[in-house]
Amino acid sequence: MPPDLPSLLLRLVVLLLLSQAEARSFVVDREHDRFLLDGVPFRYVSGSLHYFRVPPVLWADRLLKMQLSGLNAVQFYVPWNYHEPEPGIYNFNGSRDLIAFLNEAAKVNLLVILRPGPYICAEWEMGGLPSWLLRNPNIHLRTSDPAFLEAVDSWFKVLLPKIYPFLYHNGGNIISIQVENEYGSYKACDFKYMRHLAGLFRALLGDKILLFTTDGPHGLRCGSLQGLYTTIDFGPADNVTRIFSLLREYEPHGPLVNSEYYTGWLDYWGQNHSTRSSPAVAQGLEKMLKLGASVNMYMFHGGTNFGYWNGADEKGRFLPITTSYDYDAPISEAGDPTPKLFAIRNVISKFQEIPLGPLPPPSPKMKFGPLTMSLDGNLLSFLDFLCPQGPIHSVLPLTFEAVKLDHGFMLYRTYLTSPVLEPTPFWVPNNGIHDRAYVMVDGVLKGVLERSLKQELYLTGTVGTRLDILLENMGRLSFGSNHSDFKGLLEAPLLGQTILTEWMMFPLKVDKLVKWWFPLQLMKRALPQASSVPAFYSAKFPVFGLLGDTFLYLPGWTKGQVWINGFNLGRYWTMRGPQQTLYVPRLLLFGRSINKITLLELENVPHNPQVQFLDKPILNSTLHWGYNFLLSETQGSFEPMELSGH
């Protein structure tokens, strides 16, 4: 063999690989109003799935079911705040392992439509923007404000190089990337900002990747930008022909694309469970596919807002989003195929081949209980453990952002400096409670005040009376004209016309306390019922037989947070609804050892403090919207008080 032959063969192999990679392309064919994938006419039928709402061990299951439904792509967001919890500190491990999710999609031959933001909406906490941005109170989010752009640039210089190898023309599965998200619905209409983002994406990802925008029919003017492919979003109730004609005003040539075809809708606490009928969703999909459109179904599997990650809207009043993000999607929150999935699959089969073989059956479910919950202690009893560094002192109350607290709860404390002998109104001006205040006098809960509601709470006290306000962040605004949603007491409270000053702020590390549960066992104490909320309750339980998914049911409990074996399952609000059960994936349970459930009940404990685990969810039982609980001094129990919104 000639001495140069091995090196010659190596060069040939490299050239062959390069030519194959060069052949990979995903482009817009404007002349024929279509996409071309590797030079061949192509359209995607995609579905949305958010890796951050699904435990990692279930990613493969959900993606396989999507592929077996006839989809050839998956669309998902990247929430900035999920990956950069503090400036310059990044997390891409575990449930945040974006690369692992891309690989799981590739295993089932799903192409990827990526939506990295920086703003994503997604009904996610602050629309995916990190709340630490608000530590600069003068920052203008989603604009060309240099302070915002500096943070965005730093983030994308970390994120985008990670995904570069996964671009389709580089041999990966990412065929297109969205710039921003529904920017036309935002008040700023800052084209300088959009041009900056487009330039940043091009600088970090090159010229070959297809960049696009998505907006609603009325947001196209401010959301579209030359050089970015314009797409639209709408649902089954909209007129397909009319909406696509609006899109043609901004994108005269090229494929029609609905980037968010709504298979269902989100739920707010206190409103009816949202649904979309299967026939309507299927009919709308068929109309679009007959027009040759590419479609992404939002959502195909919704998942769960575990922990504190739910977002919120403001539509005349503050509307936090439920823990369940089931979305009435084709694949349920528990990962099960629904009749809607089969209706969609039938439509897709008319236009392209469906993978052979049946879909996997629903996962095993189990039910057990009831379990009796035991009182571990009043929240105030554990203040030294919840805030080991001690309080922050200020004449006027500080916000969550000012003390660098992103989620959860903060306790505000002050003492009366003069007697208040007659019942006197306690209030916070300018809707300054963000979002829910549990007001205690000398450790006894006197009432609850809530953002956007007109409320009255009358207090009395003597010199030295302790006033505690437990402030709950119920999720930052994820959509609308203002994402600068500061949390905590935004104004100084008043007692009558007297401004209360000299505050102590205790940022609470509730999740750490639950995980380090030994302090509660050391300090467990019996407290009278009247002073037992906010309080921790817990129970230990075994699980016998085959583990299955289940749904935690909390009859009679009011509002709070729940943990299973230290994992923050999310918020419950049974008194307001519509969600009555919380999805518990079987992976959170131990089959051969003792499990533990922990509740932080904020308002009212049932006379029979029990919980149950059901084999079916209850998502559609709205009970009350405007209500409060005030302590009746005559009866020694909590009674509802009707309230009206602004």
Curated annotation (Swiss-Prot):
Species of provenance: Mus musculus (Mouse)
The taxonomy runs:
Eukaryota, Metazoa, Chordata, Craniata, Vertebrata
**One of the record's GO molecular function terms:** beta-galactosidase activity
Q: Name one GO cellular component term.
A: extracellular space
Q: Which Pfam families match?
A: BetaGal_ABD_1, BetaGal_gal-bd, Glyco_hydro_35
Query: Catalytic site residues?
Result: 182 (proton donor), 260 (nucleophile)
For this chain, the family text in UniProt reads: Belongs to the glycosyl hydrolase 35 family.
The answer to whether the entry has keyword Transcription is no
Main localization, broad class: secreted
The biological process GO terms on file are: carbohydrate metabolic process
State the protein's purpose.
Probable glycosyl hydrolase.
Q: Does the keyword Flavoprotein apply?
A: no
* Sugar attachment sites: 93, 239
**Cited InterPro entries:** B-gal_1-like, BetaGal1-like_ABD1, BetaGal_gal-bd, Galactose-bd-like_sf, Gly_Hdrlase_35_cat, Glycoside_Hdrlase_35, Glycoside_hydrolase_SF
Protein name as it appears in the record = Beta-galactosidase-1-like protein
EC main class here is hydrolase
Record PANTHER family: BETA-GALACTOSIDASE RELATED
